[in-house]
């Protein structure tokens, strides 16, 4: 399953991303509550439809505060310009066997690659 980050969704909502459309059709895409939260805070065309559609995708698990701190320490994620949301997404994907993260954020992509969960979708 692929967790699609907010950066990819925003680009897709402005101009259809063919690869994402195909992955959605193959039921390979999952979501995360914090990605939905970030999108909900933005200005979206057809906001209710978009949020409802993304909310209906399979959801990646969330991690606890203690799990987040263990991830940050275990993978030395501090000082890399990541946000708390970024760290939560990394931890959530790491919990899913075969899970990968698709992002356009360079720092988040580098951290995902270091952990072994980066998607080149």
What is each of the regions a protein language model found here?
Residues 12, 18, 59-121:
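Active-site neighborhoods of divalent-metal-dependent phosphate/nucleic-acid chemistry enzymes
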Residues 1-35, 40-52, 58, 118:
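Short, well-structured N-terminal submotif of metal-dependent ribonuclease cores
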